[in-house]
Amino acid sequence: TLFRSGNKYSDLQYTSGKWGKLNAAPYFDAETDLSKRTLPFEGSLNPYLTISDFLEDTIIRVPHTLNTENYFNGNLKFDEKELAYILPIKPLLFEYFTVEEVRGNMPDGKPMLEMNILAGNSGVKVVLRIPIQGTRNIGYIEYTRLYYNNRGADVQNNEGGMTEFKFTGFIMPLVKFNNEDDAIFNVSCIQSVTNKIEFQFFKDNERLQYKNRTCRNEDQQIMNKADNYLLEGTNFDFIRVHNNHGYAGILLPVFRQQRNIERFEFAIDLGTSNTHIEFRKGNEK
Protein backbone atom coordinates (compact mmCIF):
# COMPACT_ATOMS: atom_id res chain seq x y z
CA THR A 1 0.00 0.00 0.00
CA LEU A 2 1.09 3.57 -0.67
CA PHE A 3 0.55 6.82 1.18
CA ARG A 4 -0.79 10.32 0.62
CA SER A 5 1.41 13.42 0.66
CA GLY A 6 2.18 15.41 3.78
CA ASN A 7 4.07 15.02 7.04
CA LYS A 8 2.29 12.01 8.56
CA TYR A 9 3.92 9.32 6.42
CA SER A 10 6.97 11.25 5.17
CA ASP A 11 9.51 9.23 7.18
CA LEU A 12 8.22 5.81 6.14
CA GLN A 13 10.52 3.71 3.98
CA TYR A 14 9.65 3.55 0.26
CA THR A 15 11.87 1.34 -1.93
CA SER A 16 15.37 2.81 -1.57
CA GLY A 17 14.48 5.99 0.30
CA LYS A 18 11.91 7.79 2.41
CA TRP A 19 8.41 8.47 1.12
CA GLY A 20 8.90 12.21 1.57
CA LYS A 21 6.45 15.09 1.93
CA LEU A 22 5.63 15.65 -1.75
CA ASN A 23 4.77 12.18 -3.06
CA ALA A 24 1.06 11.35 -3.18
CA ALA A 25 -0.21 7.86 -3.90
CA PRO A 26 -2.82 7.51 -6.68
CA TYR A 27 -6.43 6.86 -5.70
CA PHE A 28 -6.71 4.03 -8.23
CA ASP A 29 -4.68 2.12 -10.79
CA ALA A 30 -6.22 1.15 -14.13
CA GLU A 31 -4.14 -2.04 -14.24
CA THR A 32 -6.33 -4.72 -12.64
CA ASP A 33 -3.57 -7.34 -12.58
CA LEU A 34 -1.60 -6.45 -9.45
CA SER A 35 1.51 -8.28 -10.68
CA LYS A 36 1.70 -5.95 -13.71
CA ARG A 37 1.54 -2.68 -11.80
CA THR A 38 4.51 -0.33 -11.67
CA LEU A 39 5.34 1.67 -8.57
CA PRO A 40 4.49 5.40 -8.72
CA PHE A 41 7.47 7.82 -8.81
CA GLU A 42 9.85 4.85 -9.08
CA GLY A 43 8.70 2.86 -12.11
CA SER A 44 9.71 -0.68 -11.19
CA LEU A 45 7.35 -3.59 -11.77
CA ASN A 46 5.94 -4.32 -8.33
CA PRO A 47 2.42 -5.03 -7.03
CA TYR A 48 0.88 -2.37 -4.81
CA LEU A 49 -2.62 -1.49 -3.60
CA THR A 50 -4.68 1.70 -3.75
CA ILE A 51 -7.76 2.84 -1.86
CA SER A 52 -9.92 1.77 -4.82
CA ASP A 53 -8.73 -1.82 -4.50
CA PHE A 54 -10.37 -1.98 -1.08
CA LEU A 55 -13.24 0.55 -1.21
CA GLU A 56 -16.09 0.76 -3.70
CA ASP A 57 -16.56 3.90 -5.78
CA THR A 58 -20.21 4.16 -4.70
CA ILE A 59 -21.87 3.41 -1.37
CA ILE A 60 -25.31 1.76 -1.28
CA ARG A 61 -28.07 3.20 0.87
CA VAL A 62 -30.96 0.94 1.94
CA PRO A 63 -34.30 2.36 3.19
CA HIS A 64 -34.57 -0.16 6.03
CA THR A 65 -33.18 -0.53 9.54
CA LEU A 66 -30.16 -2.83 9.85
CA ASN A 67 -30.17 -5.38 12.67
CA THR A 68 -26.80 -4.45 14.13
CA GLU A 69 -26.79 -7.44 16.48
CA ASN A 70 -26.66 -9.76 13.49
CA TYR A 71 -24.87 -7.66 10.86
CA PHE A 72 -21.75 -5.49 11.11
CA ASN A 73 -22.52 -1.86 10.23
CA GLY A 74 -18.98 -0.50 9.97
CA ASN A 75 -19.17 1.08 13.44
CA LEU A 76 -21.63 3.63 12.08
CA LYS A 77 -23.46 5.54 14.81
CA PHE A 78 -26.55 7.50 13.85
CA ASP A 79 -30.15 7.70 15.01
CA GLU A 80 -32.08 7.79 11.75
CA LYS A 81 -34.48 4.87 11.50
CA GLU A 82 -35.42 3.06 8.30
CA LEU A 83 -32.00 3.79 6.82
CA ALA A 84 -28.81 1.77 6.56
CA TYR A 85 -25.69 1.49 4.40
CA ILE A 86 -24.11 -1.60 2.89
CA LEU A 87 -20.38 -1.78 3.63
CA PRO A 88 -18.55 -0.19 0.65
CA ILE A 89 -15.66 -2.65 0.79
CA LYS A 90 -14.46 -5.08 -1.86
CA PRO A 91 -13.85 -8.84 -1.51
CA LEU A 92 -10.11 -8.30 -2.10
CA LEU A 93 -9.82 -6.93 1.44
CA PHE A 94 -10.50 -10.43 2.77
CA GLU A 95 -7.57 -11.86 0.86
CA TYR A 96 -5.35 -10.06 3.36
CA PHE A 97 -7.53 -9.80 6.49
CA THR A 98 -10.03 -11.99 8.31
CA VAL A 99 -13.61 -11.04 9.05
CA GLU A 100 -12.68 -10.73 12.72
CA GLU A 101 -9.87 -8.30 11.89
CA VAL A 102 -12.14 -6.14 9.72
CA ARG A 103 -14.68 -5.98 12.56
CA GLY A 104 -11.94 -5.39 15.12
CA ASN A 105 -9.64 -2.60 16.28
CA MET A 106 -6.09 -1.43 15.76
CA PRO A 107 -3.63 -1.72 18.68
CA ASP A 108 -4.42 1.90 19.62
CA GLY A 109 -8.12 1.08 19.94
CA LYS A 110 -9.33 2.70 16.72
CA PRO A 111 -11.56 0.48 14.56
CA MET A 112 -10.17 -0.98 11.35
CA LEU A 113 -13.34 0.11 9.53
CA GLU A 114 -15.17 3.25 10.60
CA MET A 115 -18.14 5.07 9.06
CA ASN A 116 -19.57 8.46 10.03
CA ILE A 117 -22.40 10.62 8.74
CA LEU A 118 -21.18 13.91 7.24
CA ALA A 119 -22.44 17.26 8.51
CA GLY A 120 -25.97 18.06 7.40
CA ASN A 121 -26.50 14.41 6.52
CA SER A 122 -24.80 15.18 3.20
CA GLY A 123 -23.10 11.82 2.90
CA VAL A 124 -20.91 9.24 4.62
CA LYS A 125 -17.23 9.30 5.56
CA VAL A 126 -15.50 5.91 5.46
CA VAL A 127 -12.10 5.29 7.04
CA LEU A 128 -10.24 2.02 6.47
CA ARG A 129 -7.10 1.47 8.55
CA ILE A 130 -4.54 -0.93 7.06
CA PRO A 131 -1.78 -2.35 9.31
CA ILE A 132 1.77 -1.89 8.01
CA GLN A 133 5.32 -2.55 9.13
CA GLY A 134 5.96 1.09 9.78
CA THR A 135 7.69 2.90 12.61
CA ARG A 136 7.21 2.94 16.35
CA ASN A 137 4.67 5.74 15.98
CA ILE A 138 2.91 4.59 12.80
CA GLY A 139 1.54 1.05 12.67
CA TYR A 140 -1.14 1.58 10.05
CA ILE A 141 -2.20 3.88 7.25
CA GLU A 142 -5.63 5.42 6.88
CA TYR A 143 -7.62 5.27 3.67
CA THR A 144 -10.44 7.83 3.72
CA ARG A 145 -13.22 8.31 1.18
CA LEU A 146 -16.22 10.64 1.34
CA TYR A 147 -19.45 9.44 -0.27
CA TYR A 148 -21.88 12.21 -1.17
CA ASN A 149 -25.66 12.03 -1.52
CA ASN A 150 -27.24 12.17 -4.96
CA ARG A 151 -24.10 12.27 -7.04
CA GLY A 152 -21.92 9.93 -9.05
CA ALA A 153 -18.41 8.92 -8.08
CA ASP A 154 -15.34 10.94 -9.06
CA VAL A 155 -12.53 8.51 -8.33
CA GLN A 156 -9.87 10.82 -9.78
CA ASN A 157 -10.53 13.11 -6.81
CA ASN A 158 -11.41 10.32 -4.36
CA GLU A 159 -15.04 11.43 -4.12
CA GLY A 160 -17.49 8.58 -3.76
CA GLY A 161 -21.04 8.50 -5.03
CA MET A 162 -24.23 7.14 -3.49
CA THR A 163 -27.10 5.05 -4.83
CA GLU A 164 -30.07 3.25 -3.28
CA PHE A 165 -31.04 -0.43 -3.29
CA LYS A 166 -34.59 -1.23 -2.20
CA PHE A 167 -34.48 -4.76 -0.82
CA THR A 168 -34.57 -6.77 2.36
CA GLY A 169 -33.70 -10.34 3.24
CA PHE A 170 -32.63 -12.87 5.81
CA ILE A 171 -30.20 -15.72 6.47
CA MET A 172 -31.44 -18.92 8.05
CA PRO A 173 -29.77 -20.06 10.26
CA LEU A 174 -27.35 -17.33 11.33
CA VAL A 175 -24.94 -19.95 12.64
CA LYS A 176 -21.38 -21.04 11.84
CA PHE A 177 -21.45 -24.83 11.65
CA ASN A 178 -18.82 -26.82 13.53
CA ASN A 179 -18.86 -29.47 10.80
CA GLU A 180 -19.11 -27.75 7.43
CA ASP A 181 -20.44 -30.92 5.82
CA ASP A 182 -23.61 -30.36 7.87
CA ALA A 183 -23.96 -26.73 6.80
CA ILE A 184 -27.14 -25.70 5.02
CA PHE A 185 -28.20 -22.07 4.57
CA ASN A 186 -31.37 -20.60 3.14
CA VAL A 187 -30.86 -16.97 2.15
CA SER A 188 -33.58 -14.76 0.73
CA CYS A 189 -33.46 -11.45 -1.14
CA ILE A 190 -36.85 -9.74 -1.29
CA GLN A 191 -37.16 -6.91 -3.79
CA SER A 192 -39.40 -5.35 -6.41
CA VAL A 193 -40.08 -7.55 -9.43
CA THR A 194 -38.38 -4.90 -11.60
CA ASN A 195 -35.14 -4.88 -9.58
CA LYS A 196 -32.15 -7.02 -10.48
CA ILE A 197 -30.28 -7.28 -7.19
CA GLU A 198 -28.26 -10.47 -6.73
CA PHE A 199 -26.32 -12.12 -3.90
CA GLN A 200 -22.85 -13.66 -4.19
CA PHE A 201 -21.41 -15.73 -1.34
CA PHE A 202 -17.78 -15.66 -0.26
CA LYS A 203 -15.50 -17.51 2.12
CA ASP A 204 -12.30 -15.50 2.62
CA ASN A 205 -11.83 -14.01 -0.86
CA GLU A 206 -13.15 -17.08 -2.68
CA ARG A 207 -16.57 -16.98 -4.31
CA LEU A 208 -18.77 -19.97 -3.48
CA GLN A 209 -21.32 -21.69 -5.69
CA TYR A 210 -24.80 -22.04 -4.23
CA LYS A 211 -26.69 -25.29 -4.84
CA ASN A 212 -29.71 -23.64 -6.41
CA ARG A 213 -31.64 -20.41 -6.68
CA THR A 214 -35.41 -20.14 -6.95
CA CYS A 215 -37.65 -17.13 -7.39
CA ARG A 216 -41.09 -16.70 -5.86
CA ASN A 217 -43.68 -14.27 -7.20
CA GLU A 218 -42.13 -13.45 -10.59
CA ASP A 219 -45.56 -12.40 -11.86
CA GLN A 220 -45.35 -8.73 -12.84
CA GLN A 221 -48.81 -8.17 -11.32
CA ILE A 222 -47.32 -8.81 -7.87
CA MET A 223 -45.18 -5.99 -6.46
CA ASN A 224 -42.38 -8.02 -4.84
CA LYS A 225 -40.42 -11.17 -5.56
CA ALA A 226 -38.26 -13.36 -3.33
CA ASP A 227 -35.02 -14.82 -4.67
CA ASN A 228 -34.11 -17.79 -2.47
CA TYR A 229 -30.56 -19.15 -2.41
CA LEU A 230 -29.63 -22.59 -1.05
CA LEU A 231 -26.02 -23.03 0.07
CA GLU A 232 -24.88 -26.44 1.33
CA GLY A 233 -21.73 -28.10 2.63
CA THR A 234 -19.82 -24.98 3.60
CA ASN A 235 -19.86 -21.98 5.91
CA PHE A 236 -19.56 -18.54 4.34
CA ASP A 237 -18.15 -15.24 5.58
CA PHE A 238 -20.03 -12.52 3.72
CA ILE A 239 -22.46 -11.69 0.93
CA ARG A 240 -21.61 -9.40 -1.95
CA VAL A 241 -24.76 -7.54 -3.00
CA HIS A 242 -24.73 -6.18 -6.55
CA ASN A 243 -27.06 -5.12 -9.34
CA ASN A 244 -26.99 -4.99 -13.13
CA HIS A 245 -25.56 -1.45 -13.12
CA GLY A 246 -22.31 -2.55 -11.46
CA TYR A 247 -22.97 -1.14 -7.98
CA ALA A 248 -21.93 -3.44 -5.15
CA GLY A 249 -21.31 -3.67 -1.42
CA ILE A 250 -20.92 -6.25 1.31
CA LEU A 251 -23.20 -7.64 4.00
CA LEU A 252 -21.12 -8.98 6.88
CA PRO A 253 -23.21 -11.31 9.09
CA VAL A 254 -22.28 -11.87 12.73
CA PHE A 255 -22.62 -15.64 12.89
CA ARG A 256 -23.15 -17.45 16.17
CA GLN A 257 -21.09 -20.56 16.79
CA GLN A 258 -23.12 -23.74 16.50
CA ARG A 259 -24.06 -25.44 19.77
CA ASN A 260 -24.40 -29.20 19.61
CA ILE A 261 -26.96 -29.30 22.42
CA GLU A 262 -30.16 -28.73 20.47
CA ARG A 263 -31.40 -29.22 16.94
CA PHE A 264 -34.01 -27.06 15.24
CA GLU A 265 -35.93 -27.43 12.00
CA PHE A 266 -37.43 -24.41 10.24
CA ALA A 267 -40.16 -24.08 7.63
CA ILE A 268 -40.51 -20.77 5.80
CA ASP A 269 -43.43 -19.64 3.66
CA LEU A 270 -42.68 -16.50 1.66
CA GLY A 271 -46.15 -15.23 0.84
CA THR A 272 -47.12 -12.34 -1.38
CA SER A 273 -47.72 -10.01 1.57
CA ASN A 274 -46.41 -11.83 4.66
CA THR A 275 -43.60 -14.22 5.53
CA HIS A 276 -44.57 -17.11 7.83
CA ILE A 277 -41.93 -19.06 9.77
CA GLU A 278 -42.48 -22.20 11.86
CA PHE A 279 -39.92 -24.29 13.73
CA ARG A 280 -39.63 -27.33 15.93
CA LYS A 281 -36.93 -28.40 18.38
CA GLY A 282 -35.42 -31.86 18.24
CA ASN A 283 -38.02 -34.55 17.56
CA GLU A 284 -41.00 -32.49 18.64
CA LYS A 285 -44.12 -32.75 16.49
PLM region spans:
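Ser/Thr- (and often Asn-) enriched beta-sheet segments in non-cytosolic proteins
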Residues: 98, 114, 125-129, 140-147, ...
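Short glycine-rich, Thr/Ser-proximal phosphate-binding strand/loop in the N-terminal lobe
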Residues: 130-152, 283-285
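Non-catalytic protein-protein interaction scaffold segments in large eukaryotic complex-forming proteins
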Residues: 5-126
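Short, small-residue-biased leader/transition segments that mark boundaries at the very start
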Residues: 1-2
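Low-complexity, highly charged intrinsically disordered N-terminal segments
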Residues: 122, 145-232
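Gly/Thr-rich phosphate-binding beta-strand-loop-beta motif of the actin/hexokinase/Hsp70
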Residues: 256-284
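Acidic/polar, low-complexity linker and loop regions
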Residues: 77-102, 217-259
